[in-house]
């Protein structure tokens, strides 16, 4: 059912492409674990750089990494110093030659992961869960989103009984496979425990294109 499954996984190969673009028969497990290690390392190193997602391509003994970020200047650093440090660390981590490409996200309020992390960060700073959700919805709709839904769950406002509250505006057609829906979840560590944040953003319809190499955009 469209409302239960992860909207991104449901659309991979139809209107969304894979974030890992490689194939291996014998070494699949070890390369998959290496991918997970790379993603975790980048998330830890670039915590404050608004990283949305990371794409990994492999060719022989070389790894091409595309980092989609809302703050490219922070990733690159002055004169490329920060990206050079990151490349050297990834070279040592993987024992392979790593090439990094930084891609700027121009509209950060239309990226579900960045919106979810922003809400979580504000909740950690004791902001009102109602206000931060409504503000996120207003900003996304102003930038041209067709619809957005947010949900915060846990001990809201320090209540003894955990609950979930969600707000939405516009339409979010989860069953429509050609609907470009971005989804993400984040966690906020508060004094009362963890709060879960979920965000769905509908950015319009995308017509699927035929791809003989195995789907995707």
UniProtKB/Swiss-Prot annotation:
InterPro entries: KH_dom, KH_dom-like_a/b, KH_dom_type_2, KH_sf_prok-type, Ribosomal_S3_C_sf, Ribosomal_uS3_bac-typ, Ribosomal_uS3_C, Ribosomal_uS3_CS. SMART domains: KH. The keyword Ribosomal protein applies. Residues 38-106 form the KH type-2 domain. Keywords: Ribonucleoprotein, Ribosomal protein, RNA-binding, rRNA-binding. CDD domains: KH-II_30S_S3. One of its GO terms (molecular function) is structural constituent of ribosome. One of its GO terms (cellular component) is cytosolic small ribosomal subunit. GO terms for biological process: translation. Binds the lower part of the 30S subunit head. Binds mRNA in the 70S ribosome, positioning it for translation. Part of the 30S ribosomal subunit. Forms a tight complex with proteins S10 and S14. Belongs to the universal ribosomal protein uS3 family. This is Small ribosomal subunit protein uS3. The lineage of its organism: Bacteria, Bacillati, Bacillota, Bacilli, Bacillales.
